[in-house]
Every structure is written in structure tokens, then in C-alpha cells.
């Protein structure tokens, strides 16, 4: 199991909350530690956005718990009923992401009856808020996340895996069921990659120069993900049309294999440029135009010699996927060339997580 920064931040936040609660002299500091667990966030920007909601949820939970405690007295039944009401209110206010904090406050207030219930409720509410603030401080100060490095690493890793399967699929060297399972896994990885991209996008730059560079990087990374998704779409079609491709004209199969081989070679070179390992290679683009023309000519030629409409449709379908994949590669290379031309000092990229 890999220990990430968020795991360490959670531990630091719990420790800080417990120490601060003990130092101030708050009873039951354990509730500050519990609140710190639920309040930790994956990014600094998200911490700024959510802390107001967390404090608001804490206050709502405290008010409702105090009212029910004064009227009916603390009991397990009252804790359950109050929790249901608090959850309903959180959902109505569309701040369901703070339900856990509100419930911690409810339990902290109603778990025991003190002599002065109002003062008891106020102290417990303050204890939970202290846990929330401890997590906010840790998010702000300790171990700022490096989502750019993670984003690049995962983009390259996912793309390389997709290209590996395309090569095997073109040569009919794959087990249908195994490839199907791996395609589903790749879909999940691409969804997680989109989430990492959003976290990176949320990070804020505090200088005008770095803000401009980051905006260029965002466009570049977005296109790299789109291109990887087009490669995945091509793989899905190769897998779905595995038997149909086998019955296509032999010349078209050979031309399609050459075209996809070239696109994968081109994509590999772009990835190498993406991480700053090689220089641009103009001959690759010219060679790609030739393969594109050959694939189109082969399709038109074999379309005239083929009587079955289904084969024509499948040929057109797989060719359209290859053309779309190519267009995204062209756009990606244009963006990389532009970025490396105007921001040469920012081209050194860490690819290790």
C-alpha cells in the first residue's frame, strides 16, 4: 500500500487537534480529533471553499442538538432522531458533504447530560470547530499536493497501457474476455485521471506569470487526456469489431495496421516530447499524411469490390476512429510545440509521483 500526502496530513491534523484541545483545557478532546478526520481536504483551494460550509454545518448541528437536548433530554433515541433531522436539513441546503461534521457535533452534545447543558453544548461545539480549524491549518501549511506531477505520471502511464493493448489487438494476440476486463479498468483509470485534472485546476497561483503558464499547461494536459481517450475509443472498437475486422479485405487490414502502427509511434514520440525527453521531428507528420491517404484510398478501393454493406459500415467505423485519433494527436503536438517554444524554462517536468 502506498502512503500518500493526504494520509500523513490526516495524522498531523488529528495530532494537532488533540494537542490544541488539551492545551486549551477542553474536555473530551477526542471530538476535536474526530472532526479533524472528516474535515481534511485533498487541496488547499478546496479547504478554502469548504471551511465555511463545515462551520455552518457545525452550528446547525449544535443548535438542533441543543434544542432537542433541552426539551427531551439526551438519550440514544434523541441522538438518532436528531441525526435524521440534521441530515435532512443538510440535504435541503445542498451541503451534504458536511453531514459527517454536523453529526459529530450532534453526538458530542447529546452523548452526555451535564449540569449546565447550554455551557456543555457550547464547549462541545467549540471542540468540534477546533478540529475543523486544525485540518484547515494542516491543509494550508503541511505537504501541499503536487497534482501536476501526479497528473503527468498517470496520463503517460494510462496512455502507454492503452497503446500496448492496441498493438496486441491489431495482431489478434489478445484474449477477448481479458481485454474486456482491462478496458473496463482503463475506463476507471481515465475517470480518476479526470478527477486529478480537476484537483490540479483548482490549485491557485499567486503570481501573474505562473498563472499564465499554468493556464497554458491546463490546455495542454486537457488535450493529452482527450487524446488518450480517443486512443481508448479506438481500442474499444478494435475489441468490439474483432471478428468483423478479420473478414474485411486483406489489403484494408494491412493498411489499417500500418496506419495504427504509425499513430502509436507518433503518440509515443509526442509523449516523449511531453515529458521533455526528445526534440520535435517534422518528418513524422509528413509520413503520417501519406499513411492517411493510403488508408482512405484502400477504403474507397475495397468499398467498390465489397458487396456487403455491414463490412463497408464497419470499415468506415474503424477508419473514422483512426482519423479522429489522428486529429487529436495533431492538435496535441501543436500545443506542445507552442508551449515549448514560448515557455522553454517550464518544459522540465517531473514524471515520478
From Swiss-Prot:
<dbReference type="InterPro" id="IPR010343">
    <property type="entry name" value="ArAE_1"/>
</dbReference>
<feature type="transmembrane region" description="Helical">
    <location>
        <begin position="103"/>
        <end position="123"/>
    </location>
</feature>
<protein>
    <recommendedName>
        <fullName>UPF0421 protein YgaE</fullName>
    </recommendedName>
</protein>
<feature type="transmembrane region" description="Helical">
    <location>
        <begin position="67"/>
        <end position="87"/>
    </location>
</feature>
<keyword id="KW-1133">Transmembrane helix</keyword>
<feature type="transmembrane region" description="Helical">
    <location>
        <begin position="125"/>
        <end position="145"/>
    </location>
</feature>
<keyword id="KW-0812">Transmembrane</keyword>
<comment type="similarity">
    <text>Belongs to the UPF0421 family.</text>
</comment>
<keyword id="KW-0472">Membrane</keyword>
<keyword id="KW-1003">Cell membrane</keyword>
<feature type="transmembrane region" description="Helical">
    <location>
        <begin position="20"/>
        <end position="40"/>
    </location>
</feature>
<dbReference type="GO" id="GO:0005886">
    <property type="term" value="C:plasma membrane"/>
</dbReference>
<dbReference type="Pfam" id="PF06081">
    <property type="entry name" value="ArAE_1"/>
</dbReference>
Amino acid at each position: 500500500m502506498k502512503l500518500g500526502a493526504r494520509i500523513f496530513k490526516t495524522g498531523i491534523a488529528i495530532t494537532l487537534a488533540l494537542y490544541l484541545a488539551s492545551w486549551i483545557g477542553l474536555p473530551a478532546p477526542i471530538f476535536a480529533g474526530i472532526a479533524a478526520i472528516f474535515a481534511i481536504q485533498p487541496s488547499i483551494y478546496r479547504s478554502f471553499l469548504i471551511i465555511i460550509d463545515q462551520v455552518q454545518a457545525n452550528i446547525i448541528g449544535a443548535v438542533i442538538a441543543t434544542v432537542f437536548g433541552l426539551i427531551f433530554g439526551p438519550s440514544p433515541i434523541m441522538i438518532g432522531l436528531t441525526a435524521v433531522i440534521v441530515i435532512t436539513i443538510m440535504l435541503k441546503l445542498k451541503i451534504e458533504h458536511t453531514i459527517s461534521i454536523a453529526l459529530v457535533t450532534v453526538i458530542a452534545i447529546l452523548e452526555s447530560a451535564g449540569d449546565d447543558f447550554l455551557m456543555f453544548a457550547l464547549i462541545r461545539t467549540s471542540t468540534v470547530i477546533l478540529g475543523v480549524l486544525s485540518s484547515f491549518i494542516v491543509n494550508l501549511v503541511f505537504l501541499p499536493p503536487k497534482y501536476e506531477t501526479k497528473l503527468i505520471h498517470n496520463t503517460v502511464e494510462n496512455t502507454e497501457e492503452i497503446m500496448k493493448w492496441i498493438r496486441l489487438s491489431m495482431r489478434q494476440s489478445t484474449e477477448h474476455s481479458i481485454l474486456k476486463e482491462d478496458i473496463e479498468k482503463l475506463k476507471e483509470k481515465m475517470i480518476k485521471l479526470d478527477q486529478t485534472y480537476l484537483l490540479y485546476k483548482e490549485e491557485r497561483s499567486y503570481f501573474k506569470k505562473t498563472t499564465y503558464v499554468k493556464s497554458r499547461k491546463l490546455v495542454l494536459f486537457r488535450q493529452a487526456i482527450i487524446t488518450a481517450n480517443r486512443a481508448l475509443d479506438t481500442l474499444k472498437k478494435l475489441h468490439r469489431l474483432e471478428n468483423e475486422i478479420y473478414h474485411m479485405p486483406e489489403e484494408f487490414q494491412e493498411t489499417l495496421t500500418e496506419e495504427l502502427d504509425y499513430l502509436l509511434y507518433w503518440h509515443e514520440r509526442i509523449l516523449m516530447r511531453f515529458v521533455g525527453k526528445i526534440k520535435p521531428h517534422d518528418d513524422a507528420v509528413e509520413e503520417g499524411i501519406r499513411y492517411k491517404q493510403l488508408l482512405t484510398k484502400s477504403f474507397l478501393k475495397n468499398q467498390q469490390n465489397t458487396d456487403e454493406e455491414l463490412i463497408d459500415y464497419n470499415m468506415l467505423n474503424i477508419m473514422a476512429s483512426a482519423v479522429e485519433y489522428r486529429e487529436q494527436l495533431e492538435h496535441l503536438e501543436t500545443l506542445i510545440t507552442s508551449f515549448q517554444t514560448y515557455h522553454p524554462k517550464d518544459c522540465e517536468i517531473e514524471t515520478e509521483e
